[in-house]
Amino acid sequence: MGPVLFVTHGGRNIGLGHVRRCLSLAGALKKRSVECEFLLGADQGVADTVSGSGFVCRQGKGDANDVVERIRELTPAVVVADSYAFTSDYFRQLAGAGRPVVAIDDLENQPLPVAMVVNSRAGVGPDDYDRHVTPQTRLLLGPAYALLRPEFADNPGRTIPPQARGVLLTLGGSDNTNLMPRLLRWVAAELGWVDLAVVLGPLFDNRQEIAATAAAIGSRAALHEQPGDVRALMLGADIAVSGGGQTLYELAATATPTVGIQLAENQTGNLSAFESSGVLTWAGDVQYQDLEAAVRTRVRHLAENPQERAAMAAAGRKLVDGRGAERVAAAVMELAGTE
């Protein structure tokens, strides 16, 4: 089949969730010998992330005219679009270029004149799209279609110690609210015996403050800058404290009990659904006045309750099996008429 064109956004204010979802799907397509190209409305750091993953990456203005022009030049088999900035009219213009369009969505808040919608949010169903798609639109809904890297499909069993020994702190690709230094201090003070693994995303501007905070804590705190194997860090942790984006699916797949923090308004649905599924405990919004107390209470409770950690781990693995990218890749190839 012809190439697949990915159109997405990323950056310090947006994060990397959209880009990482697309990279996971592109990786699954690449395994099926499908060529993939990215057209980004993003800063150089994001472009470097895509290029470093082995894909052709072009930076454009990000508007629909720019994308339509590239569609006409490339004539891709399928166009995959993922950004909260993309409106119904934007999708309509892309579809008007004559190639099937796939929308990666998790808001269910606007008409999507596309051939296929992928939404991995827990709790989403066809009724959420009744007014937003045509009967011909194929819907791939729920965590079975979570777009994760292939290593998350292969996870060993998790040992649940009586008391937690390691905590993973991860906030995604950026830290615009400077939460990580505070989070590190809070958890270190509350759980004075645990080892702390701190993940620094590629768009973190506060590395020096985080490093100074970790140095003050001592050898218990280890910094991991853009780790190549974040799955291993998740499997090595007894608890994670995480933002409410794409990382939640990875933590569920690795059966990592989690304290969730809402970093953006669009994470509400994710966090609510994951908490209802028993996969995490939600501490609140990053602007919540009593966030420190909420985080400290929850990490201590989990650290000292192995039965609750075991229940969360089982719920996570039941919800997300890590094979979503394979399923979506197969559906994209069907859409292109090659499978």
Which sequence ranges carry the predicted segments?
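Active-site and donor-binding regions of nucleotide-sugar-utilizing enzymes
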Residues: 6-16, 21, 25-28, 40-132
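Short hydrophobic beta-strand element within catalytic cores of glycosyltransferases
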Residues: 40, 240-242, 257-266
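A nucleotide-sugar donor-handling region in carbohydrate enzymes
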Residues: 113-178, 206-208
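Donor-nucleotide binding loops and adjacent catalytic segments primarily
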Residues: 155, 161-237
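Acidic donor-binding loop of glycosyltransferase active sites
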Residues: 235-246
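C-terminal "capping" alpha-helix adjacent to the active site of nucleotide-linked donor transferases
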Residues: 282, 290-307
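A short, well-ordered alpha-helix in the C-terminal region of glycosyltransferases
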Residues: 301, 308-322
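C-terminal alpha-helical cap of glycosyltransferases
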Residues: 321-339
